[in-house]
Amino acid sequence: ITEDSIVDWQKNGSYDDSVYVHNHVLRAIINNTWGENLKSSNNYTANEEINLSYNISISSLEQFNINHSTNELFMGNGNTGAWDTNKLNIVAYIYNVDNKEIIQVEELHL
C-alpha cells in the first residue's frame, strides 16, 4: 500500500524543505517481503488468469506502523499515522524468482 501527497520535511542538498510533497510512500506490505506463490506449481500458461483476495484493515496496518516506527517510539516525530484513505493505492507485481526481473506491475487507487 502506498500513499501520495504526504507533505513533510525533505533534505534537498543544502536546502531543508519543510513542505515537500512525497508521493508513492510505502505504507504497508500485505504479504511477506518477497510476496507469495500465485499457485502451488510454477507452471503458467499465456493469458492465464489467477485471482487472489485479501481482507485487510487499513486502521490495523496504520496502527502497526505507529507501534513499530523508530521515529515515533524514540523521537516522537514520525509520520506513520494519519493515513489519508483518499490518497492510498495498492501496488501489485509479478516477478521472476530466479533473476528478480519484474514481469508485470499494476497500481490501483483504493
Q: Each predicted region: which residue ranges?
A:
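Short, conserved sequence motifs used for protein processing/export or organelle targeting and
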Residues: I1-L110
